[in-house]
Amino acid sequence: MRLHFLSELTLNTFIMDKKRVYTFGNGQAEGKADMRNLLGGKGANLAEMNLIGVPVPPGFTITTEVCSEYYELGKDKVVELLKADVEKAIANIENLMNSKFGDVENPLLVSVRSGARASMPGMMDTILNLGLNDEVVEGLSRKTGRPRFAWGSYRRFVQMYGDVVLGMKPVNKEDIDPFEEIIEKVKEEKGVKLDNELEVEDLKELVKRFKVAVKEQTGQDFPTCAYEQLWGAICAVFRSWMNERAILYRKMEGIPAEWGTAVSVQAMVFGNMGDTSATGVCFSRDAGNGEDLFNGEYLINAQGEDVVAGIRTPQQITKIGSQRWAERALSLIHI
């Protein structure tokens, strides 16, 4: 019995002492490129980019091992194990960004992203603009002088959080998306066809109706506490490791389930602040044929999901990319 007790004590000490959170920012990082098994591809590369001087928003990565602990120990225990380290890491971001998580006048907003050791594009979930609520959005509007940007970001956040964390994302193609249904209804009422034609007051109305939909579908009010939002998002990313899309993709690609996913939390950088902001994606090689050619695409005044949503046509980053895009377009016209 004594030996059993000692082994449990040793195990509990190991569980409590294990490093689970790795920070990065301001040219420093606790991780590096060869730690992708522990930090995932995204977390390891974010750390390495900091170390080589690439300007990267500060943040932290929760290890892939915690994903396994999430399924072994449960949500409450994992939050307990992470709480002190995550709060310390958030304080580090606050210091580097000169802003405060959950603060009304000078808010820090963050993104929460997945990151397995092997690339699994589009299979798991992301949440942007986390930290907003009805008071913080007004503070962000005053701070930036851009109410449309602030309320547009809030609208996106409520929709993404509802989809990813609260489970409101449609499962099948025939399922009705409650948020898209509301957007279409408001556009019809306002007599516009495009999302970007909606005014600030329309965006406020969208947020109001979104939160009503959350209450009706989940029985819960939309969370207003920044840390409650953060823990919900972190755990949702871990849950997404076992969603149907991810499981099927892993089977196709031969990726073991026990690898797990890391979670990277970063200070937000906004591509939707106006015509001098943009979001995009780039590659060091041509994804179609493997050619050693830098390429990519971007959208002005947009956020990440807009690039892949197919709602707007992105621009090519390079001149040769634009030329090739034009050639392909002409060939389709001739067909």
Give, region by region, the residue ranges found by the protein language model:
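Short, Lys/Arg-enriched N-terminal segments with co-localized hydrophobic residues
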Residues: 1-15
